[in-house]
Amino acid sequence: MSGRTEGGAAERDHNPVAQLLPRFLLVLALTPLPTPAFAHASDRGHVLLLPTGYYVAGGALAVAASFLVLALLPSDFLDRFWQRRLPLFAFGDGARTIVSLLSFAGFAILIAAGLFGSRDPLSNPLPLTIWTLLWVGLVLLQGLFGNLWSWLNPWYGPWRVVSRLFGEREIKRLPAWLGYWPAFVLFLAFAWFELIDPAPDDPARLAWAAGLYWLLSFAAMLVFGYLDWSRGGEFLTVFFTMVARFAVIERNEDGRLSFCWPGAKLINAAPLSLSGTAFLLLALSSVSFDGLSKTFFWFGLFGINPLEFPGRTAVVGIGTFGLVLMFVLLAAAFILAIVLGQRLAGSKHSLGQAAGLLVWSIVPIALAYHVAHYLAALLVDGQYAVAALSDPFALGWNLFGTADMQIEAGVVAGADSAWWLWNVQAGVIIAGHMLAVLVAHGLAWRLHPVPARAALSQFPLTVLMIAYTVFGLWLLATPAAG
């Protein structure tokens, strides 16, 4: 959450867009070069020199080594690896409606707190819950334990109640060609609001945005049906469902739970349409741009001194262009890697089929970026959220006994904290890319049963993953503001 609110009113006269593209491409070309950089802790207020060049080189080599090892393994070995399950127990859906109704009630209270509670984003539970507990904490839990959002989302329970009270009405069908495009557009709007809007932390502003989104989504579910709109229109459900495929908990159609390897559920996923592929790439590019947009390098492109940041209002145009450009460049690089891989393997599969299947390997990378990028915010702002929930309307309440808790911001401040935080973040980034290579190989064998062709098809995509590993570590290490 930190760093989203407007930081000043001074405006500057720049013409940044004309200068941006060549310089932006330059940084993507230069980031693979391992050079000393500055590591940062929460909000990057503390920087110290660390041998990050060794981490960058080591991360790139680890991802490359993963590809080489997998290329030499027999296909049946990995097939047995992915299919292993440890059965647990059955878990029914009986309480799902009640849990969703409780979630909706909590959401309504948060909206009221946003409108009538404290104006301080670190004291009001609405921005802390949405930007920290939901967008960071729940994404992490979803990636570890599976689709918790299907129970926690605030639409399912109210939809069931309305359907029961007024009966099942005839619903309109969404055109098949729409696919995930509604969710893509809404996710792009969400990313713009989070990263570009001058004050997404403002409680009242966020309350109006979140409340309006809930109403529009609920209306769409009544018109087009809960399942159809959830699968292709409601971006949070689409995103959380995709992330849940990486989890180590699997639930079959009979409701039985079992342990599986991380990413195992991605191997059997159906190919995504063009819109689904675009959605996953947007999920990765948006969090990547969030990191890039705060770097000294980014500000330097436009002659902005990061120590005299003019405020988010002054960089709305720059940010909007950068958000879109980041998606376009990532999508172009991904498609190019798929095209080259298909040609190397002599594949007869269409580009859409290959890209729609292999894009599932982006999920571990997107999840790793999300966790690594927002880890410091989760550790600090999560404490503020726990405190704020005890007194949602700033009336002096202490509902859970946490209103007066001491916030331990030192957990991410200082040289020692910067060292361990950098190591955890770097480890998450590297592990995410290594798992992505593993998943990509499993998916490639579905396209190319011949092991040699499967390995050849993955070479360009692995090069892209190595480059993105370096880029991700550079983002974590380079000096940044905000």
Predicted features along the sequence, with ranges:
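Juxtamembrane boundary at the C-terminal end of a transmembrane helix
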Residues: G472-G482
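N-terminal secretory/membrane targeting signals
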Residues: N15-A39
